[in-house]
Each structure stands twice: as C-alpha cells, then as structure tokens.
Amino acid sequence: MISIEKFEIFGREIWIAVFFEEKIDGVTFSLDGCEYLMERINSLKALLERRNVSVNLAEEKSDYPKIVYNVLVGDIENQDALRFLSFRGVTPFEKKVYEVLTKKVKRGSVITYGELAKMLSTSPRAVGNAMKRNPYPIIVPCHRVVLKSGLGDYTPKREYKQFLLEIEGVKGWTS
C-alpha cells in the first residue's frame, strides 16, 4: 500500500509518500509538488520491484508519512525510526551500511564516503552505490554523506540534499 501526505517545513511544501505492508518498504518525497512526487513514486516502485518487493499502489492512510516527517524535523531520532523499516529487498551489505550510517552520523553532522567506508572496511564506491539505492531517504540519512571535496550528488536532486542539511543546521556543506 501507499500513504501520501503533504507537510510544510521552512515555508516549503514537502510531499512524503511511503510504501508499506506491516513495515515501511520505501520512502520518497518531493519539494516540487505532487506531480513530481508521482515521478518519484514511479522510480521507487521500479527500484522495489527490481528487488522483488511487491508494491501495491492502493492508497491507505497510515502514520508512516508523519513518522518520516517527524524524523525530518528532529522530533524522532533517525536510529529510533529504524524499527519501522522492513529492509525487504535490501542486501545484507546495504542494511549494514544503512544501520551504521543511521546510528553513527547524527543530525547536524556529515561524513565523507571515505570515512564511512573506513568504518565499514569497504570502498567509498561501495558506500556510494548503497546510498544511491537507499529506499529509505530521510530515515536513513544518505544526505549526510558527502564528498571530501564538497556536497556530492543526491537522488532525486542535489537541491534536496542541500535543503535537508539546512533543516538539520549543517553549516559549510550546503553552498
């Protein structure tokens, strides 16, 4: 099922969509309106289906979008929200990356791909690939992973990464 809700933060609308069964299978969001959210939903649906996670597009009201929003604004700690995630379709390596990132890199801070890779005894490229395939943005804070030389990319848009870091009060990585 899918639950969609619109919130406002820092004077901007944010649309949050959550795929779920008993737990969250995937999260996506848009700062560019409902139409763009539909594109993001289709991308997430494709990612989940490639991972053999069945997706039901029937809309059903749930608390999950509000939980994601509460993580975004800091009312719920990221690591406390991990319990809501199903991790269905996520590889054991990706799960480890997501858990380490979420537990070790707190709100208001960033880590480089290389630093996170060192913590996991892997390569920065492997960490980057896991971040690119993260089905749980905001809860698993892939926006907190940056290049040594600057902000780096972000799916769906680099501007979204900047916005998320600004919300968290991160200085120096958002310009």
UniProtKB/Swiss-Prot annotation:
Which gene does this sequence derive from? ogt
Active site: which residues? Answer: 142
Q: Spell out the note in the miscellaneous section.
A: This enzyme catalyzes only one turnover and therefore is not strictly catalytic. According to one definition, an enzyme is a biocatalyst that acts repeatedly and over many reaction cycles.
Q: What is its main location?
A: cytoplasm
This entry's Gene Ontology molecular function terms read: methylated-DNA-[protein]-cysteine S-methyltransferase activity
Where found in the cell? Answer: Cytoplasm
**What EC number(s) would the UniProt record show?**
2.1.1.63
Q: Would you tell me the protein name for this molecule?
A: Methylated-DNA--protein-cysteine methyltransferase
Does Lipoprotein show up as a keyword for this record?
A: no
Q: What class of enzyme is it?
A: transferase
Q: Read off the CDD domains from this record.
A: ATase
What superkingdom heads the lineage?
Archaea
* Gene Ontology cellular component annotations, sorted alphabetically: cytoplasm
Which processes are annotated in GO (biological process)? DNA alkylation repair; methylation
Swiss-Prot/TrEMBL keywords: Cytoplasm, DNA damage, DNA repair, Methyltransferase, Transferase
Name the job this protein performs. Involved in the cellular defense against the biological effects of O6-methylguanine (O6-MeG) and O4-methylthymine (O4-MeT) in DNA. Repairs the methylated nucleobase in DNA by stoichiometrically transferring the methyl group to a cysteine residue in the enzyme. This is a suicide reaction: the enzyme is irreversibly inactivated.
Q: Name one Pfam family in it.
A: MGMT_N
Q: Which chemical reaction does it catalyze?
A: a 6-O-methyl-2'-deoxyguanosine in DNA + L-cysteinyl-[protein] = S-methyl-L-cysteinyl-[protein] + a 2'-deoxyguanosine in DNA; a 4-O-methyl-thymidine in DNA + L-cysteinyl-[protein] = a thymidine in DNA + S-methyl-L-cysteinyl-[protein]
Q: Which family does it belong to?
A: Belongs to the MGMT family.
